[in-house]
Design a protein with these regions (language model features):
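Core residues of folded domains in eukaryotic genome-function proteins
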Residues: 22-26, 35, 45-49, 76-81, ...
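Structured beta-strand/turn binding interfaces of compact recognition modules in eukaryotic regulators
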Residues: 32, 53-56, 83-86, 100, ...
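Eukaryotic short linear interaction motifs
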Residues: 36-37, 57-60, 88-91, 101, ...
Length: 140
């Protein structure tokens, strides 16, 4: 399981390696207002939110991004978000992010689960369980 706990020192003349974090059905959140809008939209639709707090410089974040995108397409009953911890530093700090990637699972704006690190099998397991619970809730 990989994770990054601090930003590496880079020289100013080095181009940053940007990864496409918002592919598939993944929504890139760039403001607190956009976060609030997405959570409200998910609550209205009865969707569970999977929020990936990530960083462009983090190797494990880059590694898990395509898998996260695949999951977003496989489970459209969930809302998949990604937050760049460097773009929304204060907001990320308010979520007590100690390492990236950190995945939060939210229902009606409240945290119901959390996963720290790029652990594909565990992420798959948690997302499948969340999707199953949403499907079960809609059948009742």
């Amino acid at each position: 399981m990989g994770l990054c706990s601090s930003k590496p020192e880079t020289r100013d003349d080095e181009p940053e390696n940007h990864v496409e974090f918002s592919a598939g059905n993944v929504h890139l959140v760039t403001t607190k207002e956009a976060w609030d809008e997405k959570l409200a939209e998910a609550s209205r639709g009865g969707k569970i939110v999977v929020a990936n707090f990530s960083a462009t410089w983090c190797g494990p974040c880059k590694m898990i991004a395509p898998f996260y995108s695949e999951l977003s397409e496989k489970y459209p009953s969930l809302m998949f978000l990604v937050v760049d911890v460097d773009e929304l530093t204060d907001f990320s700090t308010s979520w007590d992010i100690k390492a990236t990637p950190t995945f939060f699972f939210l229902k009606e704006g409240q945290q119901i689960d959390k996963l720290v690190g790029a652990n594909k099998p565990e992420l798959q397991r948690k997302i499948t369980a969340m999707a199953d619970s949403v499907a079960h809730d809609h059948r009742i």
